[in-house]
Amino acid sequence: LPMDGAVNPYSLENIKGMYQYLRKHGELYIIEYLENGEWNPIGDVTFWREDMPIVIGRKDLHGRGIGKRVVHSLIERAREIGYSEIYVQEIYDFNLASQKMFEGCGFRRMEKTEKGWRYVCRLNDIKDKSNA
């Protein structure tokens, strides 16, 4: 299923449009996984103060802490930039794994949205991993 829970996969045009939008709004990163001595792209994340959409496309790699490591890295990036808060605009109600992962990284529910929850991470409330 696409990230938004729609039944039909995105068309190539939709995907191109999505990446153009994301590149304009934030820092777009491709997530890679080392497997058999080679780095393979497995997902992406875009980072800006107002949102952090992340996708790990390979189901066999879900639950291995990859997303958590990416989010922790982006929290450190937010500190470098000087942000005091960062947000996730919406995590869908059905996506309990993402809710748990973001909450484990220090994000807290901020407000109910149409399809889920908006989250905030107040950087002063969580430990700086770079000094640990």
PLM regions and their residue ranges:
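Conserved beta-strand-loop-alpha-helix junction that forms the acyl-donor binding cleft
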Residues: 88-99
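Catalytic phosphate/metal-binding cores of nucleic-acid and nucleotide-processing enzymes, i.e., regions
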Residues: 1-3, 9-10, 73, 90-92, ...
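Active-site rim helix/loop that mediates acceptor-substrate recognition in acyltransferases
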Residues: 6-27, 35
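C-terminal "cap" of GNAT-fold acetyltransferases
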Residues: 112-132
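A short, internal acetyl-CoA/4′-phosphopantetheine-binding micro-motif in the GNAT/acyltransferase core
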Residues: 32, 51-66, 91-92
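Conserved beta-strand in the GNAT
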Residues: 30, 38-51
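Conserved acetyl-CoA-binding loop of GNAT-fold acetyltransferases
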Residues: 103-113
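Conserved acetyl-CoA-binding loop-helix of GNAT-fold acetyltransferases
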Residues: 63-77, 99-104
